[in-house]
Amino acid sequence: MAALPITWKAGSDVQTYEKARIGRVFNHRRPDRYPIAVIEAKEESHIVEAVRLAREKNCRLSVRSGGHSWAAWSVRDGAILLDLGQYKQIDLDEKTGIVQVSPSTTGRMLNGFLTTKGRLFAGGHCPDVGLGGFLLQGGMGWNCKNWGWACEQIVAVDVVTADGQQLHCTEHVNSELLWAARGAGPGFPAVVTRFHLQTRPAYKHMRSSGYCYANADFQKAMKWILSITDGFDPDTEVVLVASYPPGSEGIVHTVLFVAFKNDPEEARRALQPAQDSHPAGTVHEWFNRETSLQDQYKDQGAANPEGHRYRVDNAYISNDADVASVLEEAFTTLPTKKTFSLWYSMSPGTRRPLKDMALSMQTDHYFATYSIYEDAKDDDLASSWVKKVMAGIERHSEGAYLGDSDFQVRRTRFWGEKQGVKLMELRRKWDPKGTICGYLDEGDKSQQNGLANVHEWSAKL
C-alpha cells in the first residue's frame, strides 16, 4: 500500500495547501472554509484510511469527486477533505454491459471508453463533471425525460461506511445504502468507492435541430415547445435556453432538439414535427444537423466555462403553472452576457412510477439559471438577480434538484415527504456520529439532522 497522500493545513506551505483545498473547485467564488487536511486518494486503501483517520482525529470527513458543486460542498471547516480526483477506474463487463467506475470518472471519460465498445451511459451533459456527485444527486442525464434518471441505472455501489467497513450494496444486500445512493446527494452517509452502472447500446446517428428567437418572442417560443413536447419522439431530448450567443447584443431563445438514433432517416423523421410546426420569425435555425456526443460535450463546456464565478439556482415548476409567465423574467432579463437560463422537458418520464429510491422530486418542467461572470465586483449583481427571479418562481414550484442548489442560500423540498424522512433516518443510522459531512446549509449547522425538506419560503408568507 502506498503512503497516504495527505496535505496538512498546519505545517504545509500556503501554495501547496491552497492548491489541494481549492485547486479542483470549479466555481471561482472561492469558499472561506478551511479543512484541517486534504487527502488525494490514489487507491481504495487510501479511502479506507481516510475514514479511519477522521474517526481517530474526532473530526468530519468531506468527499470531492470533482463536479461543479456550485457551493463547493466538499470544502468544510475543521474536516479532512478526501479528494478522489486521482483515484481512477473504468472496467466493462461486455457480457452484461455493466461498467464499474470510480466517482471521479467524468461523463466524457466514460463515454470515450464506452464508445469503443459500442456502449453508452446517459451521464451528465457537462463533460467535466465527475460521476460521483452527479449520480448521488439523481443524475439528470442525456434524454432524462425519456430514458429516466441516471441513478436508476446504478446496479450496485461499493462503499466505505462511516465506521470504516467496506460493503457491497445491491437491491438485496445492504439495500438501504443503494436506496440512498439513488438521490441522497451530498448527504449520503458513506463514501462511494465504485459505481456499478448498466450501460445501453450506443447510437450510430445523432442529429440536432435548433430554432432561435429574439427576446421579444420568448412567449411564442415557450408556448410552442410546451405544446409539442409531451408526444415528441422518445429518443429526443428537448430544451429551451435563453442566452447571449457569441457576438449577439440581445438575448436569444433557442429551442434545441437532440435525437439519438441508429438510422439517419429515422432521426430526420423524429425531428420533422418540430420543423413543420415551429413558429415563423426565427433569427437563426437549423434542421437535422449531424452531431455527436463529443460535439455536444464541447458545446456544454463552452456554455459552462472554467475560471468563472457562478451563482446558480433551480426549481421544478408545478405541472399546473402558467410556465411561460412564471419563467418570463428569468429568461428575458439575464444580468450578464455569459448567464443563461434553461427549461428542460421532463415529461413523459415524470408520468411513470419511479423506482423505490431516495430520488423522488420531479415535475414536467425543470428550470435552472446560471449567472456566470468573471469579476468579483459582480457578485452582488449576480446574487441579487438570482434571488429576485427565484422569489417569484419558487411559489410556483414543487421543489428543487440537488445538483443545481446551494442550501446556504435557499432551502426547499428536495424529496417526497416519505422519502425525505426515510433518508434522514438512514443518515443517522449509518453515520450516528456525523463523521461524513452532510448537507452544507447556512453556517454548516445541519449535521446529522440533515435538511428539513420543506418550502422555507412558505413560512414567510
Language-model segments: which ranges?
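Soluble FAD-dependent oxygen oxidases
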Residues: 1-461
